[in-house]
Amino acid sequence: MSWNFSPMSGPWLATHIWDYYDYTRDKKFLRKVGYPIISSSADFVVDYLWRHPDGYYTAAPSTSPEHGPIDYGATFLHGVAKEVLMEAVTASEILGRDKHKREEWKNVLDSLMPYKIGRYGQLMEWAEDIDDPDDRHRHVNHL
């Protein structure tokens, strides 16, 4: 693959900022540095997702970053969205900020497309069961 379309890379990186806070419990860091990045990443996720006719939030276009095909509803995307939204909700509660945003994040979080198991017993990487049983990639995406 010579290029990659991965709009969730920013929110994925924001989850590492939460990891730093989670380890240090440095509320000053969370307030001044972490929360602005985490909350803006959660806002991006809310803006990027759309409600599929089945009622779940998903994204299109969407890719499995290490496997390439473009479809809707990549599990990697849902995993990152779920994590950054949960972290934004928790950080908002800790800091007592953005109650209106927190409710929006929770609403999207509660309606994210769930993880699915495919016909081969695998965690599906896309909303449709298009995984290739002959794919010898060394691992599934980082979730």
PLM segments and residue spans:
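Active-site core of glycosidic bond-cleaving carbohydrate-active enzymes
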Residues: S2-T15, D19-T24, K32, T75-L143
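Hydrophobic alpha-helical bundle architecture
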Residues: D22-S39, D43
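Short, flexible coil/linker segments at or flanking structured domains
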Residues: D26, D47, P69, P133-R136
